[in-house]
């Protein structure tokens, strides 16, 4: 006789927990969205790079062209004099400086 009210109370408790968590999660989402994407001044353009598949960086330049142009450039290492590709320059300098310290 007491099993049915206890079961209903448990279902109500779980429903209330789910509702509160959903509401707080949604409120957090709306708050973050309004803080990051909100445009309070209509004269200032909104800079966003949230479009899926966007190839533009924050300066509206094509990311793929920038990657290929910098990676294809070669820089000379001042420690050993070798020519290193731009994409590997930081790693090389790190190793080169470690060798020099030893």
Curated annotation (Swiss-Prot):
It is found in: Nucleus. The keyword Transcription applies. Its main location: nucleus. It holds the Pfam family Sgf11. GO terms for cellular component: DUBm complex; SAGA complex. Coiled coil: none annotated. One of its GO terms (molecular function) is zinc ion binding. The keyword Zinc-finger applies. Gene3D superfamilies: Classic Zinc Finger (3.30.160.60). Keywords: Activator, Chromatin regulator, Metal-binding, Nucleus, Transcription, Transcription regulation, Zinc, Zinc-finger. GO terms for biological process: chromatin organization. A zinc finger (SGF11-type) spans 75-96. Functions as a component of the transcription regulatory histone acetylation (HAT) complex SAGA. At the promoters, SAGA is required for recruitment of the basal transcription machinery. It influences RNA polymerase II transcriptional activity through different activities such as TBP interaction and promoter selectivity, interaction with transcription activators, and chromatin modification through histone acetylation and deubiquitination. SAGA acetylates nucleosomal histone H3 to some extent (to form H3K9ac, H3K14ac, H3K18ac and H3K23ac). The long N-terminal helix forms part of the 'assembly lobe' of the SAGA deubiquitination module. The C-terminal SGF11-type zinc-finger domain together with the C-terminal catalytic domain of UBP8 forms the 'catalytic lobe' of the SAGA deubiquitination module. Component of the 1.8 MDa SAGA transcription coactivator-HAT complex. SAGA is built of 5 distinct domains with specialized functions. Within the SAGA complex, SUS1, SGF11, SGF73 and UBP8 form an additional subcomplex of SAGA called the DUB module (deubiquitination module). Interacts directly with SGF73, SUS1 and UBP8. Belongs to the SGF11 family. This is SAGA-associated factor 11.
């Amino acid at each position: 006789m007491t099993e049915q009210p206890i079961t209903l109370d448990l279902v109500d408790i779980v429903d209330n927990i789910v509702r509160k968590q959903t509401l707080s999660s949604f409120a957090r989402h709306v708050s973050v969205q309004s803080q990051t994407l909100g445009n309070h001044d209509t004269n200032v353009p909104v800079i966003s790079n949230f479009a899926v598949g966007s190839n533009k960086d924050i300066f509206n330049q094509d990311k793929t062209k920038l990657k290929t142009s910098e990676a294809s450039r070669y820089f000379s290492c001042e420690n050993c004099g070798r020519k290193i590709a731009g994409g590997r320059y930081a790693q090389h300098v790190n190793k080169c400086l470690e060798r020099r310290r030893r």
